[in-house]
């Protein structure tokens, strides 16, 4: 499969247990793929010091102290797994600080808790996490609390549900998985296509069961074709599934039923799956899922 190249994660931390779960995710990830490194980042907004006369050294010392406290649990988790990490503390807007680090620190993937707390505004979808998903071009994995790994064995984290609809945006999720396999990460993929149900009656005519099955199969196979070829070309173990229904609900339902440890999807898509569009299907999946969701742009 190739040489194990260190995979570098950016983990925003703010002292909340949700942000600590992001560090736990990376620690569990490393159980199957030891070649991991992490950059922990904590940002303190300028308004944290509203009544202070700016004194560069004094404020930066306090920023470092706050960042050290906010990252304590995350650092303990990573150290216990002997993961190499570095802590960055910055004074500034959290979104800007995270986005800059994603660009400048040779990061492969951003991993964020779905919610946060404290003086650093919440890492809640719709706020910092939501903005980062839009701002950075890297894959972003959203990890839910209190502990996304409670039900999962270490290997299950690498049983991935990958949702595709045949669009180039969805195929980026497939390429993400393909690269993981080439890098040496052991993965098993459940490749799914969700087809919108045929209306019960169209122009007064209801389709037969055979007609419906043929429709779903033909549309699903077409949407899955390129993804199947891409995964098969590098020896990824995968199964295909074609299901009719609400895309977000079915993605989450299948992930649970197939005992997947993570959902991977493109942030934009078109076609019969109603579009895996951030703010629509992908946004709903992030809210509905109990397991980590990786969004690939």
Label each PLM-derived region with a short phrase.
Residues 1-5, 23, 32, 99-150, ...:
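Gly/Ser-rich helix-loop-strand patches that form or flank binding pockets
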Residues 14, 90, 116, 165-166, ...:
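Structured loop/turn residues at secondary-structure junctions
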Residues 27, 72, 130, 175, ...:
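Active-site phosphate/pyrophosphate- and oxyanion-stabilizing loops and adjacent acidic/basic residues
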Residues 39-41, 86-90, 141, 190-192, ...:
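General small-molecule cofactor/ligand-binding pocket signal
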Residues 57-69, 209-222:
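A short acidic, glycine-rich active-site loop
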């Amino acid at each position: 499969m190739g040489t194990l190249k260190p995979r570098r994660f950016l983990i925003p931390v703010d002292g909340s247990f949700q942000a600590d779960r992001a560090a736990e995710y990376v620690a569990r990830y490393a159980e199957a793929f030891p070649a991991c490194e992490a950059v922990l980042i904590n940002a303190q907004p300028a308004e944290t010091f509203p009544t202070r006369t700016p004194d560069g050294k004094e404020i930066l010392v306090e920023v470092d102290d706050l960042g050290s406290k906010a990252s304590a649990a995350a650092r303990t988790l990573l150290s216990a797994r002997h993961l190499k990490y570095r802590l960055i503390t910055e004074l500034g807007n959290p979104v800007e600080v995270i986005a800059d680090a994603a660009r400048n620190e040779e990061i492969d993937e951003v991993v964020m808790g779905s919610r946060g707390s404290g003086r650093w505004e919440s890492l809640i979808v719709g706020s910092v996490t939501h903005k980062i998903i839009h701002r950075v071009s890297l894959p972003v994995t959203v990890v839910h609390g209190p502990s996304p790994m409670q039900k999962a064995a270490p290997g299950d984290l690498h049983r991935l549900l990958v949702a595709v609809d045949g669009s180039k945006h969805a195929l980026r999720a497939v390429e993400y998985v393909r690269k993981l396999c080439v890098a040496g990460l052991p993965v098993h993929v459940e490749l799914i296509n969700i087809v919108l149900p045929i209306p019960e009656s169209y122009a007064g005519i209801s389709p037969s069961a055979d007609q419906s099955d043929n429709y779903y199969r033909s549309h699903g196979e077409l949407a899955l074709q390129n993804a199947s070829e891409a995964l098969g070309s590098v020896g990824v173990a995968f199964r295909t599934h074609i299901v009719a229904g609400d895309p977000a609900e079915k993605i989450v339902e299948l992930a649970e039923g197939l005992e997947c440890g993570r959902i991977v999807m493109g942030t934009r898509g078109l076609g019969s799956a109603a579009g895996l569009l951030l703010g629509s299907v992908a946004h709903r999946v992030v809210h509905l899922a109990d397991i980590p969701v990786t969004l690939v742009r």
